[in-house]
Structure formats: structure tokens, C-alpha cells
Amino acid sequence: MNARGCAGRIMKSKSIRGRQAKALVDGSYNERKGLAGFGVYLRVPNKVHELYGYVDRPGDSSKNILGEVTAALIAIKYAIKEHCSKITIVHDCKGIEKWATGEWKRNIPLTQAYHEDVNELMKSIDVSFQHVKAHSGDENNNRADKLAKQGCGLK
């Protein structure tokens, strides 16, 4: 997993002080197709972006976690592209924050690479995390969930 490879490459980007983004991210997994889906509901000043897709990594057993970390990386990269100086990642998977900050051990290559990629991206943008309970009625979190399912062909 490489931040530069998950959604294209971001070249140098000058952020605008005070410009903030908020992204609700989620992952899903389609057992039948063997695809991890990612969903990002991203708000930047004066814009809303809905991003979704799938990641296919044969032999990878991380299932929806692959979609979760991909969504977070794409959200951060997109905020950098939008010249934001700060992004809040709202997630329902505690690992999104805990692997990034090093609070949890990174026992598999996916979480190790995610930690490295997020920390590299943090050189260009201030990243904070906010946990929400999954399927708790939060409309925007539900939207990210639907996007992730759509990304891997579940809806």
C-alpha cells in the first residue's frame, strides 16, 4: 500500500492557511467478487466530493480493512490536492487513527504501509481523527458506507 499509488500522485501543492476539509470514510468487502470497496464523503470549502471505488489485491486477507485505509489515504490526498491545510478524518474503524498514530501495533504489511503513508502525507497537511459509531444513524457516515458498498459492487 503506497499513498502515491492508491489514487495517483500528488505533486507539490501549496496549502491555503485555514482551509479545512472534513472526510467521512468507510470500507466494505464483497466476498463473492473478492473486492474491497472504499467510500469517501469529503467536504472542502464550497464543495462536496463523493469518491468510491475498489481495490483488488489478490492474496490479501485484510478484506474491508483494505477499503478503510484506502479511503483514508484518498481523502488526505484529495484534501492536499484541494490546497487544504487541515483535514479531519471521520471514521468508524478505530484502526484508521490507531495505526496512523502508532497507538496500535501494525502486524501486517497493509497497516505498516498505511502508517508510513499517512505520516508521510502529514508533512503536507494537518490530519486529525474523529471516531463515530458504525451504523448509528449519522447521515454522512451512512453515505460513506453506501459509497464503499457501491465501490465493491454490493449496491
Regions found by a protein language model. Give the residues of each.
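RNase H catalytic domain
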Residues: 28-34, 73-143, 147, 152-154
